[in-house]
Amino acid sequence: MIIGVSGIQGDFREHKWMIEKLGHESYVVRTPEDLEKVDGLIIPGGESTTMIRIMKRIGLFEKLKEKILNGLPVYGTCAGLIVLAKEIENYPQESLGVIDIKVMRNAYGRQVDSFDEMVEIKGFNKPFKAIFIRAPRVDGWGPEVDVLSTLDNHPIMLRQKNVLVTSFHPELTDDTRVHEYFIKMVEEYRK
């Protein structure tokens, strides 16, 4: 099983290391053809408008959307959440629209406002240290979206079928449980 990490822009190396720490092969995805080599894909934190612009320029945007709609498991953190979201409230930009959520970019402040918080996640036996860096806030979600964790009454981890998103950065911790959760999603997809 190979877990892809989008290497277009952002903190992809940290996700790659996390996947390898769990004993799985990782692959940095930079072209539409690379999608054929992976069983699941992580879209990291970074700058969502830059990611989308580059994805469109190299032909990855439409190919990725097609693969996700056909069942490819995908996990987006922070900017990756924005890239996957159906609607961005405070900034007009295109997105893949594959998870029925409405988000506000940078809702938790600027870089200097970064923080971490111990949060409860559905199915986890103890709290998880969630790190928020210029994080988006989810302000609305559809009936098919499962809220897995919240902070101050706003979802911070959600899943809709084969799409998982977090507004925080689990790859910046030593705790592998969120990545393990995604790997289980990929294993289910491969069956």
Swiss-Prot record:
* Pathway linked to the protein: Cofactor biosynthesis; pyridoxal 5'-phosphate biosynthesis
**GO terms, molecular function:** glutaminase activity; pyridoxal 5'-phosphate synthase (glutamine hydrolysing) activity
Q: GO cellular component annotations, sorted alphabetically?
A: cytosol; glutaminase complex
Q: Binding residues for L-glutamine, per the UniProt record?
A: G46, E47, S48, R105, I133, R134
Q: Which reaction does it catalyse?
A: aldehydo-D-ribose 5-phosphate + D-glyceraldehyde 3-phosphate + L-glutamine = pyridoxal 5'-phosphate + L-glutamate + phosphate + 3 H2O + H(+); L-glutamine + H2O = L-glutamate + NH4(+)
Which Gene3D superfamilies has this protein been placed in?
3.40.50.880
- Which InterPro entries does UniProt cross-reference here? Class_I_gatase-like, PdxT/SNO, PdxT/SNO_CS
Q: Which domain of life is it from?
A: Bacteria
Q: Name one Pfam family in it.
A: SNO
Q: What is its EC number?
A: 4.3.3.6, 3.5.1.2
Q: Which keywords, in A-to-Z order, does the entry hold? A: Glutamine amidotransferase, Hydrolase, Lyase, Pyridoxal phosphate
The Gene Ontology biological process terms listed for this entry are: glutamine catabolic process; pyridoxal phosphate biosynthetic process; pyridoxine metabolic process
Catalytic residue positions:
C78 (nucleophile), H169 (charge relay system), E171 (charge relay system)
**NCBIfam families on file:** PLP_synth_Pdx2 (TIGR03800)
**Whom does it interact with, and what assembly results?**
In the presence of PdxS, forms a dodecamer of heterodimers. Only shows activity in the heterodimer.
Family designation: Belongs to the glutaminase PdxT/SNO family.
**What is the annotated role of this protein in its UniProt record?**
Catalyzes the hydrolysis of glutamine to glutamate and ammonia as part of the biosynthesis of pyridoxal 5'-phosphate. The resulting ammonia molecule is channeled to the active site of PdxS.
What PANTHER family is this protein classified in?
Answer: PYRIDOXAL 5'-PHOSPHATE SYNTHASE SUBUNIT SNO, PYRIDOXAL 5'-PHOSPHATE SYNTHASE SUBUNIT SNO1-RELATED
What's this protein's name? Pyridoxal 5'-phosphate synthase subunit PdxT
Q: Which organism is it from?
A: Fervidobacterium nodosum (strain ATCC 35602 / DSM 5306 / Rt17-B1)
Q: What is the lineage of its organism?
A: Bacteria, Thermotogati, Thermotogota, Thermotogae, Thermotogales
Gene (name only): pdxT
